[in-house]
Amino acid sequence: MPHRKKILLSDSNEAFSMLLTDSLRERGDFRVFHARDADETTEVLHRHRPHVLLLDFLLPHKGGFHVMQHLREDRYKISTIFMTALPTHKVIEEAYRLGASFVL
């Protein structure tokens, strides 16, 4: 049996997270983890070593950029899709500078 791809969804919006998690599970053989803030995201990253990170810009307390900076400092290699409802040029540019694979 092939290994399932592991995805970490880091978003504080519970309804959105449940909808996206269900959608991912229906469309593929994915194992989806969920984190609600930057600290929980970092903890899940180190515990489960996911292949993909779906990361919200507006996480409580420290925010998505804090997580990306942590990944960069630790030289943690992961495909990161940075999600934002505030797609300003500055936010998009900073996300890519910190290592985002894609910005939504």
Locations of the language-model features?
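Non-catalytic signal-transmission and effector/linker regions of two-component phosphorelay proteins
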Residues: 1-8, 12, 16-18
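Two-component/phosphorelay signaling modules centered on CheY-like receiver
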Residues: 14-33
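Alpha4 helix (beta4-alpha4-beta5 surface) of REC/receiver domains from two-component response regulators
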Residues: 66, 87-104
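Acidic, metal-coordinating helix/loop segments flanking the phosphotransfer/catalytic sites
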Residues: 34-52
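Short amphipathic alpha-helix used as the core "switch/output" element in two-component signaling
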Residues: 43, 65-76
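Acidic catalytic/metal-coordinating carboxylates
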Residues: 37, 63-66
